[in-house]
UniProtKB/Swiss-Prot annotation:
SUPFAM superfamilies associated with the record: Ribosomal protein L25-like (SSF50715)
Function according to Swiss-Prot or TrEMBL: This is one of the proteins that binds to the 5S RNA in the ribosome where it forms part of the central protuberance.
Designated name of the protein: Large ribosomal subunit protein bL25
Keywords: Ribonucleoprotein, Ribosomal protein, RNA-binding, rRNA-binding
Family according to the record: Belongs to the bacterial ribosomal protein bL25 family. CTC subfamily.
Gene3D superfamilies: Ribosomal protein L25, beta domain, Ribosomal Protein L25, Chain P
Quaternary assembly: Part of the 50S ribosomal subunit; part of the 5S rRNA/L5/L18/L25 subcomplex. Contacts the 5S rRNA. Binds to the 5S rRNA independently of L5 and L18.
Amino-acid biosynthesis among keywords: no
Cross-referenced InterPro entries: Rbsml_bL25/Gln-tRNA_synth_N, Ribosomal_bL25/Gln-tRNA_synth, Ribosomal_bL25_b-dom, Ribosomal_bL25_C, Ribosomal_bL25_long, Ribosomal_L25_dom, Ribosomal_uL5_bac-type
CDD domains documented for this protein: Ribosomal_L25_TL5_CTC
């Protein structure tokens, strides 16, 4: 998301506590709180339908927003939590944290896989097994990437993609030091089964 910062428009919530939050929900709003920085926590509310649309669009929690609340200066925020109804799975409350563009934060970033047709292993019927569809990275708040890209060109059956083999966006680094696996290309089940049978036959002949 190293481009234009999208606006998140909210209203200041006059009341606080569970009663005020319930009233906000009855009015078709989702209550929330803005915290962090040098200012006091700010109770807010966002129209339910608007928030739901943004959540369905994806990557809401890995997007830096320009929060606009009437009567307050615009501030950059990131969502730290969205509470949901346990039955309906609909948003009931959200927590936003104030940030500076230079702040370092940890976020889960989506992994995109490209050039499937250029992977010999997939052409032979191999299966791309994604171990981590998202990777936690430490990034700068003003330069949050939409995704990281894994190039499958030249990969064969049995090849493994680790974090060290991926080119990360400038300023981003994994939160885990070990060289963890992101994906691999495994043999199709039929080929794997025949290989296992061949190994069994070889073992029997040696006996």
């Amino acid at each position: 998301m190293a481009g234009e910062i999208p606006d998140l428009v909210a209203l200041e919530r006059t009341g606080t506590g569970k009663g005020a939050a319930r009233q906000a929900r009855r009015d078709g709003m989702v209550p929330g709180i803005v915290f962090g920085g040098d200012n006091e926590p700010l109770p807010i509310q966002i129209p339910f339908n608007r928030l739901l649309k943004m959540l369905k669009a994806g990557r809401f929690k890995s997007t830096l927003f320009n929060l606009k609340v009437e009567g307050h200066e615009d501030v950059r925020v990131i969502c730290r939590d969205v509470q949901r109804d346990v039955v309906k799975d609909l948003p009931t409350h959200l927590d936003l944290m104030r940030l500076r563009r230079t702040s370092r934060i940890k976020l889960f970033i989506h992994v995109d896989f490209v050039n499937h047709a250029a992977a010999p292993g997939l052409k032979k019927g191999g299966v791309l097994t994604v171990v981590r569809p998202e990777v936690e990275l430490e990034v700068t708040a003003g330069d949050i990437p939409e995704s990281i890209t894994v190039d499958l060109t030249g990969l064969n059956i049995g090849d493994v993609v680790t974090i060290s083999s991926v080119t990360l966006p400038a300023g981003a680094k994994p939160t885990v030091e070990r060289d963890f696996v992101i994906a691999n290309i495994s043999a199709p089940s039929g080929l794997a089964a025949s290989a296992a049978e061949e190994e069994d036959e070889e073992g029997e002949s040696e006996e």
